[in-house]
From Swiss-Prot:
Molecular function per GO: rRNA binding; structural constituent of ribosome
Disulfide topology: none
Annotated protein name in UniProt: Small ribosomal subunit protein uS14
Species this protein is from: Buchnera aphidicola subsp. Acyrthosiphon pisum (strain APS) (Acyrthosiphon pisum symbiotic bacterium)
Family affiliation: Belongs to the universal ribosomal protein uS14 family.
Cellular compartments per GO CC: cytoplasm; small ribosomal subunit
Lipid metabolism in keyword set: no
Entry-linked InterPro entries: Ribosomal_uS14 (IPR001209), Ribosomal_uS14_bac/plastid (IPR023036), Ribosomal_uS14_CS (IPR018271)
Keywords associated with the record: Ribonucleoprotein, Ribosomal protein, RNA-binding, rRNA-binding
Name of the gene this protein is made from: rpsN
Highest taxon of the lineage: Bacteria
Amino acid sequence: MAKQSMKAREVKRVKLANKFYTQRHELKNIISNMSISEEERWNAVLKLQSFPRDSSPSRQRNRCRQTGRPHAFLRKFGLSRIKVREAAMKGEIPGLKKASW
């Protein structure tokens, strides 16, 4: 189990990323637009750098919903491989069964 503080930190990052999404997107468009003057683009870079570090979506980490484990996360289920295996063995995931050949 991950510490509660790590789970809370991840929730905070998601909220910040959602809050600043449109502003970041607009500034990135300005930065990549070559028809805008160099000074305006540089000001956009400085403005983007002034945003909180955790507002960047690349700072987010997928975590298991049950345990908070950050590694071996399966997006399809929202769980780590360990919890997917446990749920599959109990028959809690419809249509999923252990492979045998």
